[in-house]
A protein has these predicted regions:
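A structural motif corresponding to the C-terminal end of an alpha-helix
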Residues: 25, 52, 77-78, 101, ...
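Active-site acidic/histidine proton-transfer and metal-coordination neighborhood
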Residues: 46-127, 134, 185-189, 212-222, ...
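Gly/Pro-rich active-site loop or hairpin
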Residues: 133-200
Length: 238
């Protein structure tokens, strides 16, 4: 299992610095979250990323305006293997998934949980653990129970990991989940989910600079590795 730093574009003014740091580093695998970028802006970003020799993007979060041609492009240019989308009843549904990509597209839990039949029709679930943990802490018991059940029932191909900053409400729903972390302890909640992780990649959905994300990745590797050494069951940890 590899932890991928994320190029997350909610704060798009941070993108140039991230790309330059990536270019200067030996990191050659990232996840991409083009959250606020329109097609023209994404094309410009793709050109910048394509100029980095050997760069791969195993996991891409698809915006609602991503086309089949764009999916094919990133798969061919960057070796993208897995995609995620929002549920069809969410505020930003993706729409119809091209049939030739259905086995590579996973549905994320966002402000609502995915429906079982859409998980069954596509590749499975892309858990956003910070959304789930935020819902659990805020008392959204039905949502949390649904997603936790789905984690034990459907394939988990990719995921989102962000920070939980207790006592610091975010701007979108007042929860403690944030795309910026302030302390490595903001990831301690992930110990709860060690037995429901993807097999290959954990994607950091963070706005922090690359060097800070790499520090977070090392912390998570230790945290999750230590936790896995003494638990062998599939399911949520206590």
């Amino acid at each position: 299992m590899k932890i991928l730093p994320g190029l997350t574009s909610t704060e798009s003014d941070r993108i140039p610095a991230f790309v330059e740091a990536l270019r200067r580093s030996d990191v050659r695998a990232i996840a991409l979250f083009p959250t606020v970028l329109d097609p023209a802006e994404r094309n410009e970003l793709y050109r910048d990323l394509a100029a980095i020799p050997g760069l791969t993007i195993p996991h891409v979060h698809l915006r609602t305006d991503c086309t089949p041609d764009e999916m094919r492009f990133v798969a061919e240019q960057f070796g993208t293997e897995l995609f995620n989308i929002h549920p069809r009843k969410s505020r930003h549904p993706f729409g119809e998934v091209p049939s030739d990509y259905a086995s590579r597209v996973y549905v994320e839990n966002v402000e609502i949980a995915p429906e079982d039949d859409e998980l069954a029709a596509l590749a499975g679930i892309c858990p956003d653990y910070s959304h789930l943990e935020s819902a659990r802490l805020m008392g959204s018991t039905e949502y949390a129970a649904t997603v936790e059940r789905q984690l034990g029932s459907y394939p988990i191909g990719c995921c989102h990991v962000a920070g939980i900053r207790a006592g610091e409400p975010n701007v979108w729903n007042g929860g403690p989940d944030h795309h910026n972390f302030r302390s490595l302890a903001d990831f301690d909640y992930m110990a709860r989910y060690v037995d429901v992780l993807p097999a290959r990649w954990i994607s950091l959905e963070l706005e922090n600079p690359l060097d800070e994300q790499l520090e977070a990745a090392r912390y998570l590797e230790r945290l999750l590795g230590d936790r896995r050494r003494w638990t062998g069951r599939r399911g949520l940890s206590a």
